[in-house]
């Protein structure tokens, strides 16, 4: 049997044992708890002195400082260049995390390796020392177990109840001398032979400190037993929790304590309350302190230190590849810690709704209570809704949280005023102020699906809150009180109203205040860039007057865009120096992220797809643009006799064509205005991706006109210079609708011939929307659906007719795409683009 098979068998046996033990613990614990009167437990809790609780929580938080001695020993043994204060802070955070999700201490060992590897040259020795610390966590318990084996502590009652623990006790006791001998014979560092002994002493003191915390919990709930009997129960319970491999020993530890105190005649209700207080004081309080420390300890300074550390080695294999993300993970720890704290705060104060309801039922002034209850619940829900925003470092989410904290403080002050809770709210408020100053964005993008999800989640939470309050009142036999006049009558709807008012006010203030933040470069900068680097088929639309511009720092490239509904809709590809496009887009995305906007690109080519992909985008094919090769275009030949017939017909009717160069006279503009108004027929002009009839815009390029015998303008088209590849395009094409003549054909033919004479080689006839989209069954569903629209909705919008019309000029079809964030909705993105196009 090779080593690999042995390891697999050992792993299977270990998992099987842990699972079987867990099932046994759950079943036994359920049987023990089923007979407990929870109402009596709540009554016992109400009798506890609040100052005793404060002392308990302080003691629970302070007890974990002892574990920091591990890291002090480690840093001194390896001669790390790290201050004692930093060691204590980092160690406290690691140990608090390890206590909750320790898995036998392996989580803590992994975090230690990640943090301290940047402070030492000898990584191998660091791993050896951390392994020694990991094992020594058991040796302290082993030392205490020896005291039971030699009958210093009497554990006969509990050992008779749980016989299998006796064997665990003997094995663990025997482990101590082996560890001490091994650590002294083969130490990680020959100059530190007694490190194993030091760590064992730290471990022993730490277990005793935990025992003192639990004993104090027993004193608080009036569960008096002798300390010698108690310590024996605690040691066996700790061993059971350690063997179970369950984080924190949850279940196994509690079961042994419950059975042990039961044998000593302590009521189960008191034991349960004692365990709950212990879990809160020894686990929850240190985690809260660790989260607060994390919000200060692991910030931008830590990230900069790691990036500049001479010990930081680039990733070369799988392990180092994962570790290469550590600086990003560490940078997110403060916001993650604060988000968790806000989440816990929300949950705790949701539970405190019950206190307000309980007091209100016995008070004649129901109105005041039910308004305060609605405010309290609204604030708790707002805290919960903004947890993700706080993690994402959104200033708007932090402001929501700060307002919620203030509202909860007011409600707390006027109802169940508690100095502990108000102090806690003050701490969270200060942390939110610090987070607000560090925040890297004003707000997150507002998306329809997020709004719907938020509404559904809010309704669910409010419903659960109602069920919790009603169920608790029923369990406490309070439902006999008449409820029709109580605070619960209009509570739900008032809560929704308060939430809507707060969200509406803050959202409006942010949009109003920061709508002025949007920056726009000067059009002169864009003109200079186009003159130097060239343009594209859309570059002339910088003169349309409905766009803003974003340039890079060196002003060698720019984008033209427009804001709509928390999105920046960009028209076409970037313009300018292609080498600057990466820098330009990165700056633009940073700008959009800071303001909380989505970025959407409309009508881009396939030339820069890799660039857009690098920014986490996906694509949707909008259609194809018809580009005519003027070097191959001609009206001669059998296939072109239709073109010649059209031109001959206009000649017979004495309809002429000419190109008018700017500046234009007022009379000429008025003639064009007359044709444009009749052609529009009171329809609204489109914007953004096309030009509009505007004298300033039209005066930027020549205009082709067709005149009748009376020299009156009957049709016109505006030119769009592209400033690249000898190409030209047309924008507005309008004619008198009452004339039964192929005026659009006439304009196109004359423009094509004129452009060819002027030396242009390409002519852009515009896009055929949804053309050649989703034609294969391998295409995305959204594109296949768009393709069906192209085929079957020709009566609603002439998709096919437009392509057929342009196809007779034998163009080359070039695809055009919509580019949008991968976590955004296609239909929402298309909707925003259409709103930009159809509204000025």
UniProtKB/Swiss-Prot annotation:
Bilayer disposition of the protein: Multi-pass membrane protein
GO biological process: lipid metabolic process; phospholipid homeostasis; response to antibiotic
EC number: 2.3.2.3
Subcellular location: Cell membrane
Highest taxon of source: Bacteria
A GO cellular component entry from the record: plasma membrane
Keyword terms of this UniProt record: Antibiotic resistance, Cell membrane, Lipid metabolism, Membrane, Transferase, Transmembrane, Transmembrane helix, Virulence
Principal localisation: membrane
Recorded catalytic activity of this chain's protein: L-lysyl-tRNA(Lys) + a 1,2-diacyl-sn-glycero-3-phospho-(1'-sn-glycerol) = a 1,2-diacyl-sn-glycero-3-phospho-1'-(3'-O-L-lysyl)-sn-glycerol + tRNA(Lys)
Intervals, Extracellular compartment: 30-52, 111-128, 183-200, 251-271, 359-369, 472-489
Sequence similarity: Belongs to the LPG synthase family.
Function as written in the Swiss-Prot or TrEMBL entry: Catalyzes the transfer of a lysyl group from L-lysyl-tRNA(Lys) to membrane-bound phosphatidylglycerol (PG), which produces lysylphosphatidylglycerol (LPG), a major component of the bacterial membrane with a positive net charge. LPG synthesis contributes to bacterial virulence as it is involved in the resistance mechanism against cationic antimicrobial peptides (CAMP) produces by the host's immune system (defensins, cathelicidins) and by the competing microorganisms (bacteriocins).
Name of the protein described by the UniProt record: Phosphatidylglycerol lysyltransferase
Natural source organism: Staphylococcus aureus (strain MSSA476)
């Amino acid at each position: 049997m090779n080593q690999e098979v042995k390891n697999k068998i050992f792993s299977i046996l270990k998992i099987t044992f842990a699972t079987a033990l867990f099932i046994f613990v759950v079943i036994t614990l359920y049987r023990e708890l089923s007979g407990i009167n929870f109402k009596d437990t709540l009554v016992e809790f109400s009798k506890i002195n609040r100052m005793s609780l404060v002392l308990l929580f302080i003691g629970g938080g302070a007890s974990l400082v002892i574990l920091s001695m591990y890291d002090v020993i480690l840093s001194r043994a390896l001669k790390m260049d790290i201050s004692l204060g930093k060691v204590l802070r980092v160690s406290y955070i690691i140990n608090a995390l390890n206590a909750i999700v320790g898995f036998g201490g392996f989580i803590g060992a992994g975090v230690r390796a990640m943090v301290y590897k940047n402070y030492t040259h000898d990584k191998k020795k660091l791993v050896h020392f951390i392994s020694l610390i990991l094992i020594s966590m058991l040796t302290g318990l082993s030392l205490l177990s020896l005291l039971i084996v030699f009958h210093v502590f009497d554990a006969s009652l509990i050992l008779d109840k749980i016989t299998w623990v006796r064997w665990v006790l003997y094995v663990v006791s025997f482990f101590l001398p082996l560890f001490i001998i091994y650590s002294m014979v083969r130490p990680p560092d020959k100059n530190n032979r007694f490190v194993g002994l030091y760590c064992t002493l730290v471990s022993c003191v730490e277990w005793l400190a935990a025992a003192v915390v639990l004993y104090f919990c027993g004193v608080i709930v009036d569960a008096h037993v002798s300390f010698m009997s108690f310590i024996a129960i605690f040691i066996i319970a700790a061993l059971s929790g350690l063997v179970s491999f369950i984080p924190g020993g949850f279940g196994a530890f509690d079961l042994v304590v419950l059975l042990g105190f039961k044998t000593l005649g302590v009521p189960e209700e008191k034991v349960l309350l004692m365990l709950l207080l212990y879990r809160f004081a020894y686990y929850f309080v240190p985690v809260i302190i660790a989260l607060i420390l994390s919000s200060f300890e692991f910030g931008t300074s830590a990230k900069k230190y790691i990036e500049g550390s001479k010990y930081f080695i680039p990733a070369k294999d799988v392990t180092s590849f994962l570790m290469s993300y550590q600086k990003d993970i560490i940078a997110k720890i403060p916001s993650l810690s604060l988000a968790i704290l806000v989440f816990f705060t929300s949950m705790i104060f949701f539970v405190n709704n019950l206190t307000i309801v309980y007091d209100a039922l016995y008070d004649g002034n129901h109105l005041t209570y039910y308004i305060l209850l609605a405010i309290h619940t609204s604030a708790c829900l707002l805290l919960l809704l903004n947890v993700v925003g706080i993690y994402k470092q959104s200033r708007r989410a932090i402001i929501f949280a700060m307002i919620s904290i203030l509202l909860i403080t007011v409600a707390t002050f006027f109802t169940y005023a508690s100095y502990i809770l108000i102090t806690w709210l003050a701490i969270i408020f200060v942390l939110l102020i610090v987070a607000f100053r560090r925040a890297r964005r004003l707000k997150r993008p507002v998306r329809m699906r997020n709004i719907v999800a938020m509404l559904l989640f809010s309704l669910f939470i409010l419903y659960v809150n109602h069920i919790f309050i009603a169920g608790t009142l029923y369990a406490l036999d309070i439902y006999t009180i008449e409820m029709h006049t109580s605070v619960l009558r209009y509570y739900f709807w008032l809560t929704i109203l308060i939430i809507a008012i707060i969200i509406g006010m803050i959202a409006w203030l942010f949009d109003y205040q920061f709508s002025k933040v949007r920056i726009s470069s000067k059009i002169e900068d864009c003109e200079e860039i186009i003159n130097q680097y060239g343009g594209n088929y859309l570059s002339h639309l910088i003169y349309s007057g409905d766009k803003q511009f974003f340039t890079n720092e060196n002003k060698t490239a720019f984008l033209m865009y427009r804001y709509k509904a928390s999105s920046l809709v960009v028209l076409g590809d970037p313009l300018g120096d292609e080498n600057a496009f990466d820098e330009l887009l990165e700056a633009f995305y940073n700008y959009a992220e800071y303001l909380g906007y989505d970025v959407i690109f409309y009508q881009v080519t396939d030339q820069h797809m890799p660039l857009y992909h690098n920014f986490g985008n996906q694509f949707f094919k909008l259609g194809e643009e018809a580009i005519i090769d003027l070097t191959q275009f001609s009206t001669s030949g059998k296939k072109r006799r239709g073109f010649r017939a059209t031109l001959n017909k206009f000649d017979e009717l004495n309809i002429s064509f000419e190109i008018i160069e700017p500046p234009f006279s007022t009379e000429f503009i008025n003639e064009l205005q007359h044709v444009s108004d009749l052609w529009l027929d009171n329809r609204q002009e489109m914007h953004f991706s096309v030009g509009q009839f505007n004298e300033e815009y039209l005066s930027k390029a020549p205009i082709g006109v067709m005149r009748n015998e009376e020299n009156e303008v009957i049709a016109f088209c505006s030119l769009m210079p592209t400033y690249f590849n000898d190409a030209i395009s047309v924008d507005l094409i309008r004619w008198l609708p009452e004339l039964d003549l192929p005026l659009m054909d006439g304009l196109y033919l004359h423009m094509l011939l004129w452009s060819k004479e002027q030396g242009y080689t390409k002519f852009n006839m515009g896009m055929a929307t949804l053309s050649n989209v989703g034609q294969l069954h391998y295409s995305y569903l959204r594109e296949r659906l768009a393709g069906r629209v192209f085929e079957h909705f020709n009566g609603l919008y002439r998709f096919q007719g437009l392509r057929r019309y342009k196809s007779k000029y034998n163009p080359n079809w070039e695809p055009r795409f919509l580019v949008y964030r991968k976590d955004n909705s296609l239909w929402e993105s298309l909707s925003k683009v259409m709103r930009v196009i159809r509204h000025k």
